[in-house]
Amino acid sequence: MIVWSVANQKGGVGKTTSTVTLAGLLSQKGHRVLMVDTDPHASLTTYLGYDSDTVSSSLFDLFQLKTFTRDTVKPLILETELEGMDIIPAHMSLATLDRVMGNRSGMGLILKRALQAVSQDYDYVLIDCPPILGVMMVNALAASDRILIPVQTEFLAMKGLERMIRTLTIMQKS
């Protein structure tokens, strides 16, 4: 299983669109793809036809788990109408995660451990990241094998790219 994060510390640069497009291309090639929506705005969740206010489970629930096994993680994954593509949806409660979780030990590795529990079920995981550095972004980057940084050729998007590269450098050192 290969894990990609689609990340930039700037909103509106095409992270969600890139995630869906890449997932679609991979599934057309016969790969099993899990998408993870880590943004409280839940654009990916909505794009895939779910109402983030009424989903039966969300990424927030994953952060409440005490153990990460296939049996505990798989129920949080929803099937999409698109063949070969599933999602762990977002919910607005993700916006409170930094405050709720505090400084718990191992906070940055929760998503990585959860994805390892379902690694036999998917060929690729695509993580649609929020535009801010916080618990969700750190978890996404720590879980990733590769990072795709969409950027537009305009000043603020380039500043977002600079911040993203600084963040990656800091994480790589720690």
Question: At which residue positions do the language-model features occur?
Answer:
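P-loop NTP-binding core
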Residues: 1-174
